[in-house]
Amino acid sequence: MAKVDLFNQNGEKVGDLQLADSVFGVEVNTYAMHQVVKALLANKRQGTQSAKTRAEVSGGGIKPWRQKGTGRARQGSIRAPQWIHGGIVFAPKPRDYRMSIPKSMKKVAIKSALTSKVNENLMVVVDEIKLETPKTKEVVKMLNAFNAKKTLIITNNAEENVYKSARNIEGVQIIPVNNINVYDVLKYDKVIITKDAVSKIEEVYA
């Protein structure tokens, strides 16, 4: 089992923590991570874009001028794509971009993403993150203690005071462990996670 340092929210080491190899020490599967991220982004797309082709634009049923003798280029319809207000070539139509990913691949992907952060020393485990009142400067102080800028903070529960304190910090996102996903883990340079959240992840994904 991999051993990592356990810190308090002030950046002071308070002990060690053993991480389950079945979650934080797996072989990194880049293909699974790519597929899951691609599906997450695709599923966010609305797919409502639409434009009219020349067959759908109104008007243009009559030839604008005779074929020969005018000195102008021949034209068949004022709704051809080269005309203003003409139809669109290969016009986009509403479509469903959703992709389905097997649960087993999602598991492999999240474990691979977490393992990659551990391997690169980009995951910091803290015993807890507690704030009596919402104070952004306290979260900034914690981030500075770990030299963290673009950071994902994962807690076991949605701590309201911590959430309110972190939500306005640029480049920082805080999520409860139940909402963990591959995209967020990979998107942020560093992950700060509580000890309880680690236990929850091991319970679900081991």
UniProtKB/Swiss-Prot annotation:
> Which residue stretches belong to region Disordered?
48-75
Keywords attached to this entry: Ribonucleoprotein, Ribosomal protein, RNA-binding, rRNA-binding
Example of a GO cellular component annotation carried by this entry: ribosome
The record's annotation in InterPro entries points to: Ribosomal_uL4, Ribosomal_uL4-like, Ribosomal_uL4_dom_sf
> Coiled coil: which residue ranges?
none
Q: Superkingdom, according to UniProt?
A: Bacteria
What would be an example GO MF term here? rRNA binding
Alphabetical list of Gene3D superfamilies matching this protein? 3.40.1370.10
> Which GO terms fall under biological process for this protein?
translation
The record's annotation in PANTHER family points to: 50S RIBOSOMAL PROTEIN L4, LARGE RIBOSOMAL SUBUNIT PROTEIN UL4M
Q: What does this protein do?
A: One of the primary rRNA binding proteins, this protein initially binds near the 5'-end of the 23S rRNA. It is important during the early stages of 50S assembly. It makes multiple contacts with different domains of the 23S rRNA in the assembled 50S subunit and ribosome.
The entry sums up its family as follows: Belongs to the universal ribosomal protein uL4 family.
Q: Which HAMAP family match?
A: Ribosomal_uL4_B (MF_01328_B)
| Quaternary state and interactors | Part of the 50S ribosomal subunit.
Q: What is this protein called?
A: Large ribosomal subunit protein uL4
Q: From the UniProt record, report the name of the gene that encodes this protein.
A: rplD
